[in-house]
């Protein structure tokens, strides 16, 4: 760009008419005037802006991906999908991680995994998340848009329970996990990613990190946001519990 100080990104969330959050994305050379104009624009359309530095997935999507992945990881461990979804709903999340994967498309998740692997190269972590995504993709179970994903759907697109074929590859564990442990896994995996975003300078304001989490993807509203939640828990306990779960 000839005028890099005028270059700025504006990231809306879907569905746009319902989601209140907008991320304003600063480039390395973005000037204060551009930021101010973007803030004014977002406020004029009755949305809530947060300002973050440019980075892969920005802030909100960066934190929600681990939420989805942790839900899928628990499936591969034999934890019943119903327990995972119930744990998330009881925490106040609008959608459980498995339903959210179906809603956003399993095919999209597989594409993101391939693109991220290509970008990260040897540093890309190998775990069972890609395996389950690619397996579902091969089965043609691409999510709600295909009327077949982790959930079954009727001809009108209404969910009709979990797909039992999932247990062919990932049989249920003989032991049922503690609900609190499942909830902590879902919470901590997001909170730690928010901390990393703050440490790396993607997120510049703790308050905006909390607001972005609650408005952007519905992080347990009662908690005040991931960073406030860690503060409530206290550093010693949060650090110890993170080591145990993540």
Tell me the role of every PLM-derived stretch.
Residues 1-246:
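N-terminal glycine-rich phosphate-binding loop for ADP-containing cofactors
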């Amino acid at each position: 760009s000839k005028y890099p100080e005028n270059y700025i990104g504006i990231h809306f969330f879907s569905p746009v008419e319902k989601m209140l959050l907008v991320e304003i994305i600063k480039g390395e050379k973005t000037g204060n005037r551009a930021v101010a104009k973007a803030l004014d624009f977002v406020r004029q359309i009755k949305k809530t802006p947060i300002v973050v530095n440019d980075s892969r997935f920005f802030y909100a999507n960066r934190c929600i991906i681990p939420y989805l992945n942790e839900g899928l990881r628990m499936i591969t461990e034999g934890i019943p999908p119903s327990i995972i979804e119930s744990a998330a709903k009881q925490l106040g999340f609008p959608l459980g991680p498995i339903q959210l994967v179906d809603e956003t498309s399993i095919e999209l998740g597989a594409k993101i995994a391939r693109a991220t692997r290509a970008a990260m190269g040897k540093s890309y972590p190998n775990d069972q998340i890609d395996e389950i995504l690619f397996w579902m993709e091969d089965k043609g179970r691409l999510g709600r848009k295909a009327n077949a994903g982790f959930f079954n759907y009727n001809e009108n697109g209404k969910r009709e329970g979990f797909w039992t074929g999932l247990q062919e590859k990932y049989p249920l564990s003989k032991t049922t996990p503690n609900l609190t442990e499942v909830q902590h896994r879902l919470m901590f995996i997001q909170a730690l990613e928010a901390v990393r975003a703050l440490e790396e300078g993607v997120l510049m304001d703790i308050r905006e990190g909390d607001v972005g989490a609650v408005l952007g993807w519905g992080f347990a509203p009662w908690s005040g946001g991931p960073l406030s939640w860690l503060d409530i828990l206290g550093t010693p306990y949060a650090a110890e519990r993170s080591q145990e779960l993540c």
